């Protein structure tokens, strides 16, 4: 069967359901595909198909994750749902499936629960830009005042974690009523909450800035000296674009200030390129730079767009021994390797006050101090390695130095 062509007619946005176990994330995901399928804008994916999610590997970690896709009149969406709580944490930290926005699912009879808080905190730390709330199972509550109290509590929780709690749309409904309805009429009352939710997601979650429109950044993977022409660095452009004549900085892996140089050529597959853009694997020719003055692990970037740092806070998931991780806990002062972009850098871990040790399977915020500064920013993801195997995954939550 011929593959369908992906038509890029609408802006593409990545979303996902988050929230406490059994509050209805998977039921809601299935209900969205069901209701939008009535408009021909999705393929229905059942609860069981989502619940039995396939496993994927990201940064050496196995995660059960289900991707569904659907469209509204305005956008094309990729939506992720994870069956288990640990899978959520691993997904958010590894960025296996990036989220441009999240749908926080909260059961009205229960209100916000521990995992509700944990997912909101993580969403903040991994820089999920916006959130919409689906207040589920409202058909089990007949007291309007209680519903309003739950909404107030949710807005307060969001505000406490750095989201604009007063502005976040809260849509009430019942995902199960929508999913189990036999009606084929899109205007059936039980489908209204799903359409209202998608409208809120369309309106409130911003269309992400395309990577190509951000300042140029390319992690350096390899360095070659070319006789008579100078030094070429190769890598995959992470964001932005680059062309001959651009001024760039070489950042990280040294205690000296970043060096500026001028791009004298861009090549791809041995051919000259007018302009390299995000996603391209390119070679960049640099003026006046010796082969020995640049190395793997540094980045090439638009001047002033990213700075080298050695000390930062990070949210980390520590692999269990069944996942190939450590068998024993570690303590403050532990010195593993941090695999950042294209290379390993040694660093020391400082645990928060009152935390004695970290067990395999834990999710924790810690401070990391690298032996040499590298180009780092909030939201950057990394792996923690020991003797070449991955023992943890992390995301930078704040720069300290």
UniProtKB/Swiss-Prot annotation:
Residue span of region G5: 174-176
Cytoplasm in keyword set: yes
Keywords: Cytoplasm, Elongation factor, GTP-binding, Hydrolase, Magnesium, Metal-binding, Nucleotide-binding, Protein biosynthesis
Claim: Protein biosynthesis is one of the keywords in the record: yes
G2: annotated segments: 60-64
SUPFAM superfamilies per the UniProt record, alphabetical: EF-Tu/eEF-1alpha/eIF2-gamma C-terminal domain, P-loop containing nucleoside triphosphate hydrolases, Translation proteins
Subunit structure, interactors included: Monomer.
Protein name: Elongation factor Tu 1
